[in-house]
Amino acid sequence: MSEKKHAVNEPLFHLAKRTSISAPKAWLIRLAAIALGFLACGVVAFVLIEKLREKPEMIEDFYKCFIDGIWSEGKTLVKNRKLWKFLKNLAILQCISLAVTPAFRMKFWNIGAEGQTLVGILGSIAVAFYLLGSVPNWLLLVLMFVAAVISSIIWAIIPAIFKAVWNTNETLFTLMMNYVATFLVEYFLVIWVKNGSSTLGSLKFTELPSFYHDYFVIVLVALALSVILYIYLKHSKQGYEISVVGESVRTAQYSGINVKKVIIRTMVVSGLLCGVAAYLIAAGLDKTVTSTSVGGQGFTAIMVSWLAKFNPLVMTLVSFFITFLSRGAGEIATALRLNQSVSEIITGIILFFIIGSEFFINYQVTFHLPTRSRKKEVSE
């Protein structure tokens, strides 16, 4: 056997999974990603928007629109319409994000929050449609709440039973049930609306009790649910069982935990929270139902929960930021008279950077400067 020496080039960079990273460093990476995301948005906007190319000084107004999206200048706190719309959107997104979190901690990938919330809205509005004028308004609101919660729980518990008993793929199951929920709403609208428009107008029932502002109760409910769910997941026996099942089903079984029961019970909790969100939309906001009543927030909630590492309190900050982006991007489209797709592009770019930052939090990238090739002995 002869021995030859071959030149081996060092790789330009090396990836290694981090064993740990300090919280300040992780947040520094995230903040850097957000800053780069906003910078990239400015570059893309400059390229795509003719007004910015003609008047580069307008780039300052472009960034100012993010603040204008959540605050009306010269308005008091109570009368600040943009602020309360922002808080309303934040609260609904937070509620739906909370709904998917217990299942996610159990590694039950519930992608069906959109459909579970939509079915809850349908159940709530169905009660109002058939009982409006027949029962007192206070009783109608109570029955609407019960209908919303029960409807959402039923829609959530179906895939849970199939997973617990037959070990079906919950991701596909819950995803497909979103489409079934959409068609179910369209079916009832055809039955209820006789003129063929398939559009049900707002029903005339008493609004939810309000003080300080019409949306204040909705915001308060979202905050209360965040604290309650945090305590439930962190400091209760059921929360502990959810974590154990999420870590290892086999370990949970050896520990005497009834895994099937935990799966079904956890999805009942998720359905209940979707039902609360559905009730807030049906009784507190829209007073009607369409196939787009949830507006895709069930899917956005998945990202909120994941970015918050399934922590209900951190989720409030993530919901705040994503809603801030959405409102700001919408304000940009309105102020500069752009297509709504531009606002979605802007939001998507920033979220792409944020999601990408998680890679650098989990992995360390080491770059190697170009050096002379080193020799390596290889037996042949």
Locate the predicted segments by residue.
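Loop-to-transmembrane alpha-helix initiation sites
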Residues: 170-172, 214-221, 263, 293-297, ...
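Hydrophobic core segments of alpha-helical transmembrane domains in multi-pass membrane transport
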Residues: 30-46, 94-100, 121-127, 148-152, ...
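Cytosolic-side transmembrane-helix boundaries in multi-pass membrane proteins
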Residues: 1-37, 227, 247, 254-261, ...
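Transmembrane helix-bundle core of multi-pass membrane transporters
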Residues: 170, 174-235, 288
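Helix-loop-helix "hairpin" substructures at the membrane interface of multi-pass membrane proteins
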Residues: 211-288, 312-313
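Single transmembrane alpha-helix segments in multi-pass membrane proteins
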Residues: 50, 70-131, 145, 149-168, ...
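Transmembrane alpha-helical segments in multi-pass inner-membrane proteins
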Residues: 268, 274, 280, 284-348
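Membrane-interfacial amphipathic/re-entrant helices at transmembrane-helix boundaries
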Residues: 4-95
